[in-house]
């Protein structure tokens, strides 16, 4: 009897610990609880989330806008903490899309589109979607554009879609293009609003050694913006670019 009681107590204690652990994890990813002074630790938690679409706040079924962040290759996550917090408001839902950045960026793009489709099923009041991509995540989004446009058209909904490429690898070097069989011909015009935010190549740690600026894109309808040299007293390089763009988006809304 004592052995049974002891085992039961241990089982209950284990369940309690698991519940507390999961609760703490949920709280860690509540966008309203983000602590800007702890961005590196929070960033590690962010990129440890499972592949797929991860909600970063308490669910609001009546949200009329979705904000989705798509990380770059080997992301440490910290570069997304402030931008996602900045873009959050009481009327939207903020998500972080984890994808396998060790694969070619034109692989498994249907998964991103399917998950966006599921979000629209779950949030029936949504009128606008903002998708922000960074670095190699921009490559993944670029090769998803046609699928996203087709899927949105099939839904026959009145939706405004904003695509934001931020310091993104949109014109990959030849070896990567050949290895992944990246296409280089894109439509001149899309039904979505496309914004290309480009850092100054010479001060971008990820792109400064490229012979040509890999942030250029052949979509003529895309809005092109070159970022300044500094941001809040810092050099505006590769990772700070998301924060600068988030401020611009917030100010324009």
Please give the residue ranges for each predicted region.
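C-terminal catalytic-base region of ester-bond hydrolases, centering on the histidine
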Residues: 183-253
């Amino acid at each position: 009897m004592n052995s049974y009681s002891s085992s039961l107590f241990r089982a209950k204690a284990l369940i309690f610990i698991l519940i507390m652990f999961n609760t703490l994890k949920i709280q860690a990813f509540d966008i309203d609880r983000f602590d800007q002074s702890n961005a590196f630790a929070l960033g590690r938690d962010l990129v440890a989330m499972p592949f797929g679409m991860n909600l970063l706040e308490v669910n609001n079924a009546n949200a009329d806008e979705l904000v989705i962040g798509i990380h770059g290759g080997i992301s440490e996550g910290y570069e997304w903490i402030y931008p996602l917090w900045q873009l959050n408001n009481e009327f939207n839902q903020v998500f972080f899309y984890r994808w396998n950045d060790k694969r070619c960026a034109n692989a498994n793009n249907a998964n991103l589109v399917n998950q966006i489709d599921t979000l629209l099923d779950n949030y029936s009041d949504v009128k606008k979607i903002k998708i922000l991509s960074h670095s190699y995540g921009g490559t993944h989004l670029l090769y998803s554009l046609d699928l996203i446009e087709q899927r949105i058209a099939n839904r026959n909904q009145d939706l405004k879609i904003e695509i934001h490429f931020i310091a993104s690898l949109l014109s990959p070097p030849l070896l990567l293009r050949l290895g992944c069989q990246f296409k280089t011909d894109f439509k001149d015009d899309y039904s979505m609003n496309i914004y290309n935010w480009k850092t100054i190549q010479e001060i971008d740690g990820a792109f400064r050694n490229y012979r040509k600026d890999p942030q250029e894109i052949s979509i003529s309808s895309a809005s092109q913006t070159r970022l300044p040299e500094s941001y809040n007293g810092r050099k505006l390089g590769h990772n700070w670019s998301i924060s600068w763009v988030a401020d611009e988006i917030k100010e324009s809304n």
